[in-house]
Amino acid sequence: MSSSAEQNNWLSDLRCYQAIKNSLAGRHDHIAKAYQQQWPNFIIIGSAKSATTTLATVLGRHPEIQISRSMEPKFFGRNYRRGWEWYGQQFSGAKRHRLRGEASTMYTSSYRSYQHTPQLIRHHLGIIPLIYLVRHPLRRIESHWRHWRGRVNDCPPFHQLLESKALKQRVVEASLYHQQLMRYRRWFPAESIHCLTTEELNANPVESLNIILKFLGQPPDASKLLLSEKLPVTNSAGSKGRREVGQPQWTDELKKQTIEIIQPDSEQFLETLQWPKNTWKWD
């Protein structure tokens, strides 16, 4: 990336940070409240490359649920400076749905303009239901790198996963689920955050969706949202570019070093949620 592009990104991040800081100080409250009827009342906060698009697509089939026009508006972060009118337009439409949601997976990233996302959501939206969908940490990293490699010209090769600051921050740290969960638990009670695995969603879609619907205050009748009780198998937006990038190969040393970073956090995450210790296998 050129120094000019880096400088522009730095200036954009600085302006976004200043806007978010002003917002958290209450200086935008009067603007935000003008669009209160269009605010989302639930958010899928992550994680990236964990079937969040699939989940949002299926939930959007429910007659009482509206998903934002841009499934990942990234408003409580990089796009905050676009303003509340822009965000409200994400949920505009002739019908007023009981539930309105979005699925910006960068909300479970502390990268750059997303450092204050949990606090920003809580400040403006209050305590709302949050859904945190997580996947085997290593499989998620592989998919995330392929996604980035297929879209970003200067994305470093996979063997630089831990050497590249950008890859480590954007790709590896997104698999630190406990760290990300604790950022939200600082601002939201545990009962307002529903966590589930991609593996469970894929294996038992009807049961998983019924639990989510109940969590959102809707009757648990997910069978009407699925065709032949199966989840959609394609994600054209997320697959663009990724299909052109081969599956990355781990060297023994890279895998060992990555597991050393991620496994302690994963074990804390599983313990916090009282999930089985063998939820994910590392060999």
Regions found by a protein language model. Name each.
Residues M1-S110, H124, I128, W148-R151, ...:
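PAPS-dependent sulfotransferase catalytic core
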Residues A51-T52, G101, I121, L130, ...:
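Generic structural signal for small/hydrophobic residues in well-ordered secondary structure
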Residues T53-T54, T108-Y111, P137-S143, N202-E207, ...:
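Short catalytic/ligand-binding loop motif for oxyanion handling, primarily in non-cytosolic enzymes
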Residues W84-G88, P118, L181-M182:
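Generic structural signal for well-ordered alpha-helices
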Residues A103-Y111, Q160-V172, V245-K256:
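Surface-exposed cleft-lining segments at the edges of enzyme active sites
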Residues H124-H144:
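Conserved phosphate-donor/acceptor-positioning beta-strand/loop module used by diverse small-molecule
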Residues S143-D154, L209:
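Aromatic- and acidic-residue-enriched segments that line the glycan-binding/catalytic groove
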Residues V172, M182-E267, W275-D283:
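The conserved 3'-phosphoadenosine-5'-phosphosulfate
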